[in-house]
């Protein structure tokens, strides 16, 4: 799964968590079911059948019927699966109470975007989402290269585990004390061996950290006791895909395993903040386009959506808590459909639901958060979608100064050549 896919899937889970946490029901009619990857559907089905029998004895008629209904819905969801999916299965079923006091049935089932390590069955007056929150905890893999004048070590750190992938030693000639021609010759030989050593370090790094033309770690840490690490980072022979993933360069007192351990310790803060760093890099890339006035950038909801529909956007950047809604309405007389983009203050504007010419009531076809619509459709336009927070200085500036909505273009677009379809929103144009 690419970093981009993971970013979008994590946003979906965060959104789902917020929705589920806010939901409340009467009695114990809300079922949370989490099944581990290798657990048997048949075992869970039997457990639900037993639970159904137990719930049949609940004294309160209203609560009994609600619980039995939730168990039945859960059983129906399980019938959609012959076996537990590769990453496990999450099911939420039940009847919740809406803000206006009405009952609403909720039935959700999905395979998580990565293996889930929890088993859970709870029938309560709320949904339990701790297992989903665990999915959002980082399990990124970080690559380490420890390089000095004695050799190189390649390792990875993932969570609390570390692994040495490869190590090799080198015997580089020391500086020679002779003068004249001998000194020049030895200096040349020493530089040649040093260059060959760095080439081997760089080529081995490509072998270790690139799989199927994709970097297989979230970030790289270079460490060492001499200048080798800096030379490697700046060298043309170091794969640029890896160079772009360098998170930190640290000085360590040792090589080998001791150097690896020291490098992990010295880079711990950077590893914890890697998503923060990735976000800063992403937004800085957008700011650079703006500062250089390349014309290959866009911001503001209307122009950005125009560019998206034209297929001109390469990278779409969206603040994760954007509150804009996308509303599709239809004139029942003419059949004409129209799209409105509404800010939170405009979402109860009754004029949007009436034909401006005839005053006729318009039918609402769809109301979706714009973020949700983008998640469902961005791939149709060949764009990459990245959600960002406003927790970094760059993220905060992007949200406040650019409306939290913009993109980097594949090519320049002159928006004056295109009619603005909707200008109801977009104070950032």
Curated annotation (Swiss-Prot):
Keyword presence, Cytoplasm: yes
SUPFAM superfamilies: L30e-like (SSF55315), N-terminal domain of eukaryotic peptide chain release factor subunit 1, ERF1 (SSF55481), Translational machinery components (SSF53137)
Chief location category: cytoplasm
Gene Ontology cellular-component annotations: cytoplasm
Organism: Cryptosporidium hominis
Short name of one Pfam family: eRF1_2
Keyword flag Cytoplasm: yes
Subunit structure: Heterodimer of two subunits, one of which binds GTP.
An MF annotation (GO) of this entry: translation release factor activity
Record family assignment: Belongs to the eukaryotic release factor 1 family.
Primary gene name: erf1
Record function comment: Directs the termination of nascent peptide synthesis (translation) in response to the termination codons UAA, UAG and UGA.
Name the UniProt record assigns to this protein: Eukaryotic peptide chain release factor subunit 1
Compartment(s) where it occurs, according to its Swiss-Prot or TrEMBL record: Cytoplasm
This protein's UniProt keywords: Cytoplasm, Protein biosynthesis
């Amino acid at each position: 799964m690419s970093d981009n896919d993971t970013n979008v899937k994590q946003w979906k889970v965060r959104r789902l968590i917020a929705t589920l946490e806010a939901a409340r029901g009467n009695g114990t009619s809300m079922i949370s079911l989490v099944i581990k990857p290798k657990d048997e559907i048949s075992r869970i089905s039997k457990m639900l059948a037993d639970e159904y029998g137990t719930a049949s004895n609940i004294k309160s008629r209203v609560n009994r019927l609600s619980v039995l209904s939730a168990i039945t819905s859960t059983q129906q969801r399980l019938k959609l699966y012959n076996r537990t999916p590769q990453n496990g299965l999450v099911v939420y079923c039940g009847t919740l109470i809406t803000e206006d006091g009405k009952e609403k049935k909720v039935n959700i089932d999905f395979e998580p975007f990565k293996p889930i390590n929890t088993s859970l069955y709870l029938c309560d007056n709320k949904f339990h989402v701790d297992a989903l929150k665990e999915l959002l905890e980082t399990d990124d893999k970080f690559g380490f290269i420890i390089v000095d004048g004695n050799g190189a070590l390649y390792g990875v750190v993932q969570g609390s585990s570390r692994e040495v992938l490869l190590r090799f030693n080198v015997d580089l000639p020391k500086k020679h004390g002779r003068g004249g021609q001998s000194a020049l010759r030895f200096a040349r030989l020493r530089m040649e061996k040093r260059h060959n050593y760095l080439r081997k370090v760089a080529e081995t790094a490509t072998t270790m950290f690139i799989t199927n033309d994709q970097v297989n770690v979230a970030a790289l840490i270079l460490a060492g006791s001499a200048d080798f690490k800096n030379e490697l980072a700046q060298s043309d022979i170091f794969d640029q895909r890896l160079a772009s993933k360098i998170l930190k360069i640290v000085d360590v007192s040792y090589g080998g395993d001791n150097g690896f351990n020291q490098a992990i310790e010295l880079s711990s803060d950077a590893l914890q903040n890697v998503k923060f760093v990735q976000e800063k890099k992403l937004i800085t890339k957008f700011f650079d386009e703006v500062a250089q006035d390349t014309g290959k950038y866009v911001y503001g909801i209307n122009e950005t959506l125009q560019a998206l529909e034209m297929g001109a956007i390469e990278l779409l950047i969206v603040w994760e808590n954007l509150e804009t809604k996308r509303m599709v309405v239809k004139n029942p007389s003419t059949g004409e459909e129209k799209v409105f983009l509404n800010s939170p203050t405009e979402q109860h504007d009754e004029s949007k639901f009436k034909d401006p010419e005839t005053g006729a009531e318009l039918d609402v076809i769809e109301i979706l958060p714009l973020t949700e619509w983008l998640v469902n459709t961005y791939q149709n336009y060949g764009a990459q979608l990245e959600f960002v927070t406003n927790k970094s200085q760059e993220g905060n500036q992007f949200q406040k100064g650019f409306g939290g909505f913009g993109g980097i273009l594949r090519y320049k677009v002159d928006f004056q050549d295109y009619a603005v379809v909707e200008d109801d929103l977009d104070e950032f144009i």
